[in-house]
Regions:
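Extended Gly/Ser/Thr-rich low-complexity repeat segments
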Residues: 98-115
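Segments that shape or occlude catalytic/ligand-binding pockets
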Residues: 30-78
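A structural signal for short, hydrophobic beta-strand segments that form beta-sheets
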Residues: 78-82, 105
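Active-site loop segments of alpha/beta catalytic cores
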Residues: 1-39, 89-91, 100, 117, ...
Length: 374
């Protein structure tokens, strides 16, 4: 099977020859720790890992992904506003003003380079005037929205072997980026009409973006980024999510399904058990990363939702950090879901630096056996 066929078959309860091997990805601090623990300096971690556990190199295939940018254009200026004793007050590319450790800079807020905690001081949409100033940044015809040869590249990949998909924020995530979490929560109560207006704007922008993509080719997966849960609970009630968010999710899913995209993947950290029924109703068929520390339990989800929902992730990062018998027990815990299909197992978020390189190698070897690679 090709990589693409295997991915789709695995998530849609088909008959893959093997399950995709996706142990999880490290960030900068993790790689720095690993280089002190046995990962050679200069070695690409995945290539070295595969060699160390006895997997062949990843196939050398041409990987084309026609670029389409769902983000604001232009970005806000990234700048340092104030230097404090051990922190920086900065403006990020989205227009947020926040405080971060002086060990980092604005690049860490632009890309997921590392695990960065920040304090939010001001968000770009706090008034109606701010909102009117924000909207022009989502011009569909802005330079750079689609790469110049988007159509030509899209038409080249009809018989591709690799997975091609697009990711963009869901309505909750996007409005939180504009208004801030507390600001958005207050707007749900104080000015619901404004919330609906912003959701409608974002829904329409995404639909027009997808329409242009689907004219050229059909991706394999569309991924919604929608972090909207804490430990044990969602950030807003399921009733409020149904009222404000479900219409947008449903409209997107209808458009995506009509285009023939096989996988619609919802990404939310935290405990998502009370949200999954809404996602199924909207038309999504996969979700991730299934964070165990938040209370997510793949076995319980599978019993409750059956084959209506597939998953990626779901392996407790804390057990991987502890290693040994606890790590092996964690892999045994998820094995029934692996065997039942509709699941690509992996670490339940970015791989943190407390997972040592030796533990990660052992975990990856066990995972490769479980998924049919060894």
């Amino acid at each position: 099977m090709t990589e693409r066929e295997r991915y789709i078959e695995a998530l849609l309860f088909g008959r893959p020859d093997r399950i995709p091997f996706t142990p999880g990805g490290p960030r900068k601090s993790t790689l720095e720790a690993w280089r002190q623990q046995g990962l050679p300096e200069g070695a690409y971690w995945m290539e070295h890992l595969r060699r160390q556990i006895g997997l062949p190199p990843e196939p050398a295939i041409e990987r084309i992904r026609p670029a389409a940018d769902f983000r604001m254009i232009p970005h806000f200026e990234e700048k340092v506003i104030e230097r404090r004793a051990s922190t920086l007050v900065v403006q990020d590319w989205k227009g947020n003003i926040c405080e971060i450790s002086d060990k980092f800079d604005t690049r860490y807020l632009r890309d997921a380079i590392d695990f960065v905690t920040r304090s939010w001081l001001k968000c770009p949409v706090e008034t109606r005037a701010d909102w009117e100033a924000m909207k022009p940044r989502y011009d569909l015809d802005a330079p750079g929205r689609f790469e110049p040869d988007f159509v030509a590249r899209g038409r080249r990949i009809g018989e591709r072997q690799h997975v091609v998909g697009y990711s963009f924020p869901g309505p909750f995530w996007q409005l939180r980026e504009w208004c801030g979490f507390e600001g958005l929560c207050m707007l749900f109560l104080d000015d619901p009409a404004f919330v609906r207006e912003m959701i409608g704007f974002w829904q329409g922008f995404v639909q027009r973006m997808l329409e242009r993509i689907f004219r050229v080719f059909t991706p394999d997966v569309i991924h919604f980024a929608e972090d909207m849960a804490y430990k044990e609970k969602a950030m807003i009630s399921p009733a409020m999510a149904r009222e404000f968010l479900l219409p947008c999710w449903r409209a997107w899913c209808a458009q995506i399904k009509a285009a023939g995209v096989p996988v619609i993947d919802m990404d939310s950290d935290g405990y998502i058990g009370e949200l999954i029924p809404l996602w199924i109703e909207a038309g999504m068929n996969v979700c991730d990363p299934i964070e165990v520390a938040a209370g997510c339990d793949l076995n319980a989800f599978r019993r409750q939702f059956g084959r209506r929902m597939g998953y990626t992730g779901g392996i407790d990062k804390r057990a991987l950090a502890r290693g040994g018998q606890e790590m092996r027990a964690e892999l045994r815990r998820i094995e029934p879901v692996v065997q039942g299909g509709g699941y690509i197992p992996g670490c339940d978020h970015g791989v943190p630096p407390d997972i040592s390189w030796p533990n990660f190698v052992e975990y990856s070897r066990l995972l490769a056996r479980m998924t049919g690679w060894l």
